[in-house]
Amino acid sequence: MHKRLFTIMSLAVIFAMLLAGCAQGGGGKTLKIVSSLPMTGASLTQTQTMVNAMQLRLDQAGGKVCGGDYTVTYEAWDDASAALGKWDPAVETENANKAAADKSIIAYLGTFNSGAAALSIPILNQAGPLAMISPANTYPGLTHAAAGLTEANEPDVYYPSGTRNYARVAATDDYQGPVAAKFLVSLGVKTVYILDDQEVYGKGVADSVNQAAVANGITVIAQEGFDTKAADYKALMTKISTSNGGGPPDAIYVGSIIDNNAAQVLKDKVAIMGDNTKVKFVGPDGIYTAALIEGAGVEVAEGVFATTPGLAKKDLGEAGKKFYADYEAKFGATNEPYAVMGYDAMNAAIKALEDVCAAGGDPSDRAAVTKAVFAIKDFAGALGTWSFDANGDITLPYFLIGQVQAGAFVDFGTFVP
């Protein structure tokens, strides 16, 4: 009887060990990387390519790090809600708290919206800290002070532990504004009317353009926030059409994400002031997406200019060109510029894990991984060779400018401030 019981118990132990082995993917522990991006709403056109690129990079690593001793899994979380049709503060806060509580998560790739990052950075900062790598945030105050653009308590307010845990592969709006302003000058623009969606990102980039436009001799007629839930903007556009001494400005700049009715703003601008050769329509990375063209219509969107962090495809090195070829082979071709940002965000996470192991550390140690992220220097990524500085900012202040031509954004070139 005792012998039979012993045999049954032994088999149970062996079975449990086999299950554990399967769960760990053939040896070693399992680590988890998550992304938190708006996967509901118009931004999906941009964010799906980032998620695809993140998965592509992990697949290229075979889902393993540290010589195969650790399995790495990836989950794409949505920080948007159907109710808002865009990123939702409540959902992003929930995501950050969920990640903080799950000790298997060693990197949080996000966010897409700067306002979302302002909520999640402090939560993750007190959870290890847990490394956060954004493929897209451009508001400077998340990492550094910028005169006239950031609040007095930024960025320290986001790091209650006193240790930095947030880095990003996107250049910031204190660079994006000057790039846009200098480009406007090159187009012969002398007067501009600036609109913003009143969010951290949209107002922030609009403020930067305002500041840079004045510095470059452009007259800013006004800057105002618009109601993102309005049915139309014909009254607003009618007002703007006579704001320049009875006539229209040379250009309208719209600091907004696509989810905040940017396509409707464009439609009503064209309806009241004519096509984009008459009064130029310019915006930032938040509208640099096929969703703008789909929402406004091909004819209406023709001629729109937009800036976005990164390099024109023709200016990418071999690693960047290989990324787009690999992406196309797996998911189909894309012109969304944030795809490569997603790839290098995952690149940075994998690099940090490998570096922790190479130093004899434990890649499940959040503090060690965070330290390794900030130690990334002269990394050969898809964007080129880059580093993270002490603030967590990427050392590539490059922006590409695109113009809508025949229903698609076409690279107009790479620009620096």
Label each PLM-derived region with a short phrase.
Residues 35, 99-112, 130-135, 193-196, ...:
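Periplasmic-binding protein-like
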Residues 24-35, 65-71, 185-190:
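Immediate post-signal peptide segment of exported/extracytoplasmic ligand-binding proteins
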Residues 34-57, 61, 65, 77-89, ...:
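Extracytoplasmic "Venus flytrap"
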Residues 106-224, 280-302:
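Extracytoplasmic ligand/sensor domains, especially the bilobed periplasmic-binding protein
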Residues 26-28, 45-49, 64-154, 169, ...:
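Beta-alpha junction/loop-to-helix N-cap segments that form part of ligand/metal-binding clefts
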Residues 327-339, 350-411:
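Segments of small-molecule ligand-sensing domains
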